[in-house]
Amino acid sequence: MIPDVSHALTWLEAHPKALKGIRRGIERETLRVTADGHLASTGHPESLGAALTHQWITTDFAEALLEFITPVDGDIDHLLTFLRDIHRYTARKLGDERMWPLSMPCFIEAEQDIELAKYGSSNIGRFKTLYREGLKNRYGALMQTISGVHYNFSLPLEFWQAWAGVTDEQSGKEEISAGYFRLIRNYYRFGWVIPYLFGASPAICSSFLQGRETALPFERNGKGMCYLPYATSLRLSDLGYTNKSQSNLGITFNDLHTYVDALKRAIQTPSEEYVALGLKDGDRHLQLNTNVLQIENELYAPIRPKRVTRAGESPSDALLRGGIEYIEVRSLDINPFSPIGVDAVQARFLDLFLIWCVLADAPEMSSDELLCTRKNWDRVILEGRKPGQTIGIGCSDSRQPLETVGKALFADLRRVAEVLDGSESASYQQVCDELVASFDDPELTFSARILKVMQEKGSGGVGLELAEHYREMLQNEPLELLTEEQLSAERDASRQRQHELELKDKLSFEEYLALHGGQ
């Protein structure tokens, strides 16, 4: 069922230094809410600086949707402490508001209550807000308030030198990109293990449905909650953040050029549906353009190949220039058991799994096979903890017990863990021992644990209780890595950077849009 990686693991055991210098970064989204859990109607707090230009504290879709971004880091504990410091600082600046601790929002009465993120009067700031206007008009605003955690991951050059025989990043960009695409294909095939272990959205507040039709056989409890008894991550289901119109784009992950070509096609091809929506209503802009994707970031994907862009460069142009630099994993729900939405066990598991995805053989995949992999994900997302649950293999009809496949995967991961731990530590091996138990006992998964509490208190009740608990905890903890002075300096510098952008504009917004809007 899983590829035979014994040769690759033997190779890894002989090259332990190849894994020294893994780099990671985390992005965590969270809604600002009032004491009773309703979406905050206030603007992005002045005390946090300018969302457009702040290095660490910004906003995602909505003005109330905070996003925290860590710098790239070589050490997991240091990375998580940095993220916690950003949370501590923010918790002290939010007044009576708090950070919603779940992926799924709860007390939102009407879509029109959701204010789009604002970034000031510069052309780039207005462009970002208009992109969000397009998302709202295309998919609805409610879906965009769902929060998650993104894990950015890259292997060191030493790994690629030993594994693929490259000399440096630029001359070896094709080989390194091929290695990361192999990782991505295996992620599509086996990444359902992430929602199985860490999915934490088995339930939603009934207000989230807001009269929308759904074929899902929801059970309800008396506390305003709809749930599926064996679900792991409704955030990743069709109910959450997915995009039906994108499934026939024919995007594949076999090589850089075909991937980029398909992406570029999507941002240049008009969509009948979005042409019908129109570009403007009177003087009001409705979307950046009428193409299948307004910009490349609109592509919904559980994992993305990335390279840091230069000024004025699109994500795909950056990939063509330098190849894949790192991978962005986008399938993590907010961890409700952590005040910062993610923990070290998850980070270490992702390290292990992503390394395994590079090592394991991964035949090329057609866009049809990519769609087949979605069946396994859907099965795990909607009923992953169902007794006797099975997992398919590619597009064939043969299936195996999820428990068997999960344990076989962990036997491999434990060997990777031994290499990562070396003789100094056992932290990766401990993660394996802790998590593999979830295949014998699904009650140990995040989704089972959180659903148990939600059945007693409702998902809204759990969210309120945790939000208050984490608010007090974070407000009272001292900063460990950052200082108040550094955070105040970044706040002021972000405002200054935004101000300079606004002064620098020479074009009117209409001219800027004609140039950059893809119309």
Curated annotation (Swiss-Prot):
Native species of this protein?
Yersinia pestis
Q: Which UniProt keywords apply?
A: ATP-binding, Glutathione biosynthesis, Ligase, Nucleotide-binding
Q: Write down the EC number.
A: 6.3.2.2
Write down the Pfam families for this protein, in alphabetical order: Glu_cys_ligase (PF04262)
User: What phylogenetic lineage does the species belong to?
Assistant: Bacteria, Pseudomonadati, Pseudomonadota, Gammaproteobacteria, Enterobacterales
Per the record, the similarity remark reads: Belongs to the glutamate--cysteine ligase type 1 family. Type 1 subfamily.
Identification of the protein by name: Glutamate--cysteine ligase
- The record's top EC class is ligase
Answer whether the UniProt record assigns the keyword Ribosomal protein to this protein. no
Q: Which GO terms describe its biological process?
A: glutathione biosynthetic process
**Pathway(s) per entry:** Sulfur metabolism; glutathione biosynthesis; glutathione from L-cysteine and L-glutamate: step 1/2
